[in-house]
Amino acid sequence: MVLLTLPFLTCSKRVEYGDPAATETLTIDFGSTDLQMIAEKMVGSLLASPVVQQGHRPVILVSRVRNKTDEHIDTKAITDKIRTALVNSGAVRLVADDVRKEVMQELGYQAESGYVDPETRKRIGKLVGAGYLLTGEITSIRKKAGRKTDLYFKINLNLVELETGLIRWAEEKEIRKGQKKAVIGW
């Protein structure tokens, strides 16, 4: 009986919680550390830019970062991290692009259904228009030579003034990682 239960005891996995801010170095692929470094650099630079420093709290529409790499990267996570930091800074105002359809449906419901108290319903035509569009992309270059792999990521963000089409702010963050496979191993 003891011999039958021994394999189950030795093969069990141990789960641990980790610090989300700790450097993650399991692979050279895009990871949480990269996401945090990108968001920190981009948000810090944008908040220090003349567009934001003018003091009028610009209204920005944040579009999703485009993935131009050869791997799956959750660009929504990048966009969400940047959006959250910008909102929490209080220095800018953001237009909610990803829920615009739901907002329009709710406004229509309040205006036309007859179920919403006229004293509390919100009026159509009061949405705030964005003055700027924050857009960007992430690209990568992967090189292999023997047992070595080099991976380079670059993310670019641009803040475009919607009325003029002028780029009012731009920033990039570069990340390079290297990995050397062991001679023997998996």
What is each stretch, according to the model?
Residues M1-L9:
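Sec-dependent bacterial lipoprotein signal peptides
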Residues L9-V92, A96-R100, I184-W186:
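A structural "domain/chain start" motif
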Residues S12-V15, G131-V183:
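Amphipathic beta-strand/beta-sheet edge segments enriched in Tyr/Trp
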Residues G18-P20, T33, I38, K68, ...:
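Surface-exposed loop/turn and secondary-structure junction residues enriched for glycine/proline
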Residues D70, K76-K81, S89, V95-A145:
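Short, solvent-exposed, polar/charged sequence segments at loop or secondary-structure edges
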Residues G90-A96, G125-L127, T164-E171, W186:
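Short C-terminal domain-edge/linker segments immediately following a structured domain
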Residues G114, K181-W186:
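Short, surface-exposed secondary-structure junctions/capping segments
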